[in-house]
């Protein structure tokens, strides 16, 4: 195939081009991310304005640094938007620990990524429920909380969640640490009835801090 040629040092993938391999609806919005195959923004680089399900298809073996210029993104440990999630908001990430440094787990791989299309910091709401299927005690949240327990949530687990608007990142531990779960109003219809729907890496219903995603 003609696309097998080595890409130039800087290539731009507009939404129309990436749509060939993107299983998600092509977003139409102000998203832009530049990824590098070496730390500190060195080596091969590529610019994207839409989702990339497999960076290896672009000639990379891994992403080792990146710059988010527009919008919010979520990166994944594995191809196909699987594995641990890493929220990527506007700014520079010179090496892997810049996006997973608050994570309790040593993960240096970032193999796929996509825009967080519903991020809206000012108009975000989420309701957390004590049990699966939106049962039990509930609490509507519209602000950032580094510790749910300190604000009165009874335990360190959340059974299910509803997101009518915006996008959130939930963390396993207080202080925005541990596994990250990016939850959005435009995924699952905003209804996450069980912790297994939070991501392929979810192994527990433990959630102890939560914040709105910055667009």
UniProtKB/Swiss-Prot annotation:
Positions of the UniProt region annotated as N-terminal arm: 1-30
A GO molecular-function annotation: structural constituent of eye lens
Keywords: Eye lens protein, Repeat
Record keyword Cytoplasm present: no
Residues covered by the Beta/gamma crystallin 'Greek key' domain: 31-70, 71-117, 124-165, 166-214
BP term (GO), one: visual perception
Presence of the UniProt keyword Repeat in the record: yes
Stretch list, region Connecting peptide: 118-123
Free-text function comment from the UniProt entry: Crystallins are the dominant structural components of the vertebrate eye lens.
UniProt domain comment: Has a two-domain beta-structure, folded into four very similar Greek key motifs.
Subunit structure of this chain's protein: Homo/heterodimer, or complexes of higher-order. The structure of beta-crystallin oligomers seems to be stabilized through interactions between the N-terminal arms.
Entry similarity comment: Belongs to the beta/gamma-crystallin family.
Name this protein carries in UniProt: Beta-crystallin A3
Species: Gallus gallus
């Amino acid at each position: 195939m003609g696309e097998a040629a080595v890409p130039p040092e800087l290539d731009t993938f507009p939404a129309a081009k990436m749509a060939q391999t993107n299983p998600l609806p092509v977003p139409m919005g102000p998203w832009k991310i530049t990824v590098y195959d070496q730390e500190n923004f060195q080596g091969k680089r590529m610019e994207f304005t839409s989702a990339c399900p497999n960076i290896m298809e672009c000639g990379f073996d891994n992403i080792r640094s990146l710059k988010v210029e527009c919008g919010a993104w979520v990166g994944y440990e594995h191809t196909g938007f699987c594995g641990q999630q890493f929220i990527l908001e506007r700014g520079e990430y010179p090496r892997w620990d810049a996006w997973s440094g608050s994570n309790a787990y040593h993960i240096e791989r970032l193999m796929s990524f996509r825009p967080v299309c519903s991020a809206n910091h000012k108009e975000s709401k989420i309701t957390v429920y004590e049990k699966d299927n939106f049962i039990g005690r509930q609490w509507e949240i519209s602000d950032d909380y580094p510790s749910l327990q300190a604000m009165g949530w009874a335990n360190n687990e959340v059974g299910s969640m509803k997101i009518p608007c915006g996008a959130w990142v939930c963390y396993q531990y207080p202080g925005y640490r541990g596994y990250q779960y990016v939850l959005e109003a435009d995924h699952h219809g905003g209804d996450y009835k069980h912790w297994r729907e939070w991501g392929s890496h979810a192994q527990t219903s433990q959630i102890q801090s939560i914040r709105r995603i910055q667009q």
